[in-house]
């Protein structure tokens, strides 16, 4: 049975249409017209316990609205949601015990309290047994390297330190599900990798279900096997990350290091870009040829010292889908 399930989920907002100037504002007091803005339309998906799912889309696509409905903050206009067997907006308190939330741009820590006291306060709010609290906190302090700033007021922490504290705070009560909204925004490379390693650890060690919304697709590639793409409030793709790469990442680049510079290097039917001599880059469509066949053609004409295959970036693939919409490409035919 899925731990999260949505059926025909829809959320719209009404706003008053006002005319211009003072007259328009006064007129709206007596005769109101409304316009409806649909944020989420007919969203259907289910998530099994223990999955790590990337929920991604451009700004304004409906990601945050969906997360707010899953957490019980917003009530759907129509459709149904179940999270761990509960309807979130009907059972908000029980739902809150089942979930943890980390927002990259907002903190649940108490600004004026030292980090340790913030954790103690959250323990009391969630009524976490003291033995379990100590066990969880000891593990988080070790894996997130929190010890050196546990006595520091939250307002004095760096962004990276605060984010690590927020992750510990979100997981102290052993939630079944964690919603992560831009968890690595603004962090440096080292801090990002520490956060990614922590997410992978809690998923593997505790079986925590993770829903990740982010614009940093390196987070998605590092953590998720499955992604849900949403655009203009509608799910346009739901499936494995590798399937998306296979369907849309059709163009690869073969980087060839020649034994000697070849300024007139050419290969019929292949886009050639000259790099720092003696390197050339060959862009090819793997639906019509293979890297092996291309290497064979090159070695028949030139002496080479090294080759490497560069796969398309996931960011480029997703950008293309946003611009063109998702359509499953036809099956590829490859050269022998």
Regions found by a protein language model. Give the residues of each.
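Conserved ABC ATPase "signature" region
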Residues: 9, 21-29, 120, 124, ...
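ABC transporter nucleotide-binding domain
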Residues: 196-285
